[in-house]
Amino acid sequence: MEVLTATFVEEKLKAPVPVESCRFHFPLLRRQVNGKPLVYLDNAATSQKPQVVIDALMRYYNEENSNIHRGVHYLSEKATESYESSRGKVQKFINARSTQEIVYVRGTTEAINLVAATFGRRNVNQGDEVVISAMEHHSNIVPWQMLCEEKNAKLRVIPMNDAGELLLDEYEKLLHERTKIVAVAHISNALGTINPIKRIIEVAHKQGIPVLVDGAQAVPHTKVDVQDLGCDFYAFSSHKMFGPTGVGVLYGKKELLEKMPPYQGGGDMIKLVTFEKTLYNDLPYKFEAGTPNIAGG
């Protein structure tokens, strides 16, 4: 039996695939619009869902529907087992060291907001700086703008040339002792530029600056190894790679996640609650308040 790994998928994608055989796996692509087969090219925004994904969602609601992590009955145990099994698959898919480094969120946007609201608020102060690039998606601009406004910090932007490439010499000049984090796209959603992300990370790390990578467009199209990249945070979404909406991943180095405060309060992110004090849960659950998208996970 062939195992569905990133390398396996990458090799298969090199071979030409008949369009009709692809359509067969996607119910929505079997329909016609204006008398012609539907052609969908907006995968950078969201991908269509193959039948196997739709079947998995239906199977959860038909056979396992229950809350997770907080029940001892059969359905809760089955749902919890399936949900946590998927976390292990994500860990292996991006080669994280541990499932404790895989935080489930609603999408890339929430992952970036989580880091800005926790790591950012704790580490960025008046007069400090955050560095992003000129090709960022709004989701990797606005959270940092909001943080900088709140903290009276400065947002610096890596410029790019007419070919849509970041100017790395200018990038290096932006970094100094008051730079608290660099946040940059792995692949541009607008230009398709594949940034030299490993080099960008190495330059920042020489000055002890952590790096968040927006991988929303990269994970669906290329092999991502977070340990090889050396990134401190990596964010991506399920819905751009044939998965359901409302599911995303924040990878974070364990040593950084442990120092960050919770993002939201509620069920599942706690170990013990009294009216005097709350003891927060271990990683990654400290950042996963409330009932998640269990079916999507």
Task: Name every feature range the model reports, one short phrase each.
Residues 1-297:
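Pyridoxal 5′-phosphate
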